């Protein structure tokens, strides 16, 4: 299929380009017909077929941020990688814009596997995925349904369906709280239809209140400063559509995590507010090819871009072990 997307060609990432890695823009379609934009990275001068890894996340970010950093670093270590913008976000297609879906966004990972599996420079039996933050949960769901995925890494994982339905730390895990949320979202849905547009929720709060939780301040330090700001990132700008949680509210993203047979490495900072997502998800996983790696002292956003904290040596070793 011919691409209908308009892609920037200049280097507009939040991280420096590695001269030891070749880079180009690519596109591919998912099963719903949505065209996805991605950055492809591979070791300069190396010959395939390569083991390959598809990378996405965090939730509300774009490929020019954390996922691209991970993808480029893995390419420097010998893998062919793609960092993609999920459907409805970034340079990828899909309308309306700025919505998330556990079904479609899980499919986005499988679409990346489609793309990788037919390339001459990729070994289709050696394909893995890596999901950051909210796309860690999507990655586990993809691993549960797509048997072509041989190894999955999650870093600083969120279960977006759980946090949407239950609130942070499950403090709103009751029918009345969920009903009130449904009322609010459906009232907004009516208002959006009447207005012919979609109200945006706003990205990371700016300026950040002095009494904000530490993790909100951490998000601000990444998404709203030169460290991680990007103009196409929802978290850096206008945020998701207000009604986007409707897709997540009644779903159970990790319902079949216990049926994942392929290898999984879950990585989380032990001081992250979100660490309970990985701890709880790991208890569902079965088999001796599953590992939970907790990084002492690390918070949620440390695993976004802190090269001194992200355990790339362990990630590389994991993929070498299971993508062989």
Predicted regions and their residues:
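N-terminal cap/lid segment of alpha/beta-hydrolase-fold proteins
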Residues: 3-48
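Short beta-strand element of the alpha/beta-hydrolase
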Residues: 48-58
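Conserved alpha/beta-hydrolase
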Residues: 73-93
């Amino acid at each position: 299929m011919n691409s209908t997307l308009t892609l920037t060609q200049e280097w507009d990432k939040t991280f420096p380009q590695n001269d030891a890695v070749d880079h180009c823009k690519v596109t591919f379609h998912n099963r719903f017909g949505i065209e996805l934009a991605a950055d492809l990275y591979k070791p300069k001068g190396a010959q395939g077929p390569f083991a390959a890894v598809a990378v996405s996340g965090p939730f509300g970010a774009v490929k020019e941020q954390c996922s691209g950093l991970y993808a480029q670093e893995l390419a420097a270590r010998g893998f062919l990688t793609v960092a993609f913008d999920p459907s409805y976000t970034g340079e990828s297609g899909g309308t309306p814009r700025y919505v998330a879906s556990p079904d479609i966004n899980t499919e986005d990972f499988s679409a990346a596997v489609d793309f990788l599996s037919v390339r001459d420079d990729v070994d289709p039996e050696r394909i893995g995925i890596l999901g950051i933050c909210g796309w860690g949960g999507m990655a586990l769901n993809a691993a549960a349904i797509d048997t072509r995925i041989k190894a999955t890494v999650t870093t600083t994982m969120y279960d977006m369906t759980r946090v949407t339905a239950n609130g942070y730390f499950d403090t709103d895990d009751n029918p009345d709280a969920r009903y009130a949320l449904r009322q609010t979202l459906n009232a907004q849905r009516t208002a959006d239809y009447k207005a012919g547009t979609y109200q945006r929720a706003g990205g990371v709060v700016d300026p950040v209140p002095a009494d904000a939780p530490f993790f909100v301040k951490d998000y601000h330090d990444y998404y709203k400063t030169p460290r991680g700001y990007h103009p196409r990132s929802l978290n850096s700008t206008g945020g998701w559509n207000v009604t986007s949680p409707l897709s997540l509210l009644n779903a159970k993203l990790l319902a079949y995590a216990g049926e994942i047979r392929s290898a999984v490495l879950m990585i989380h900072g032990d001081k992250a507010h979100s660490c309970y997502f990985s701890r709880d998800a790991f208890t569902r996983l079965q088999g001796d090819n599953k590992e939970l790696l907790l990084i002492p002292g690390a918070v949620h956003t440390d695993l976004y871009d802190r090269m001194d904290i992200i355990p790339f040596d362990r990630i590389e070793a994991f993929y070498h072990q299971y993508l062989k």
